[in-house]
Amino acid sequence: MKAKIESYKSGAIYSAGLSVVVKFIAFFQNFLIAYYLGAKKQTTANQIATQGIALSVLHGILLTVLCTAGLWKFLKGFSADLEVNLMAITYGNRVLLFSVVITLGITFEKIFQSVGKMKVSMFSMICGCLINILLDPLMIFGIGPFPAMGISGAAYATGIGQTATLLIYLIFYFADPIPVKIQLKYLKPEKQVISRIYAVGIPATLNMALPS
């Protein structure tokens, strides 16, 4: 049991730590959207939101590849226990299957916050957390219709919770339109738009990460 707890903690720390980079970039995308909406530059705000969504998909794919490649080396720095590390890899690899979903959810969270829809953001995240909490014991121990999946069940519960959060954002986006429009016509990469997102987001992320 102790090994399972340690493996869960190690895998969770790794995936959560790497998602911080995406969260900070999305945060400053939020700032830019709010800034350009306030400046009455609707097209630029739409471009930042749409291209931010596309970048979040790319970030999710990159996180999956880089985290999968570096997971074992990272875990060895936390524990020399082979059993713990193998279970942590099981957890981490399954959570990483949902990387794109997680990065999209983070981006939508910041888009809704940028237009003042804080209640939607809070509601979506709470629903995702509650689903995760509810599914954890069911999928870990095999309660009800679920088979006992152990550490894999915890990972899948996390992924399903994140998927639910993203779906709720999408429902709100289409059911109650917000000032920012995510449309294909804004998807064409604009060097100036993308450079603004990274120029603000990356230094801020490094600034927050270096002291720790």
Region annotations inferred by a language model:
Residues 17, 21, 33-38, 43-45, ...:
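Hydrophobic/aromatic residues within transmembrane alpha-helices of membrane transport systems
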Residues 1-8, 40-100, 146-202:
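Short alpha-helical transmembrane segments in multi-pass integral membrane proteins
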Residues 67, 120-149, 163-169:
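Alpha-helical transmembrane segments of multi-pass membrane transporters
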Residues 15, 118-122, 151-155:
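Alpha-helical transmembrane segments and their helix-entry boundary regions
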Residues 29, 33, 70-71, 108, ...:
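Hydrophobic/aromatic residues in alpha-helical transmembrane segments
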Residues 101-125:
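Membrane-interface junctions at transmembrane-helix termini in multi-pass inner-membrane proteins
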Residues 1-39, 43, 82:
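Membrane-embedded alpha-helical bundles of multi-pass transporters/translocases
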Residues 18, 22, 26, 59, ...:
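Alpha-helical transmembrane segments of multipass membrane proteins
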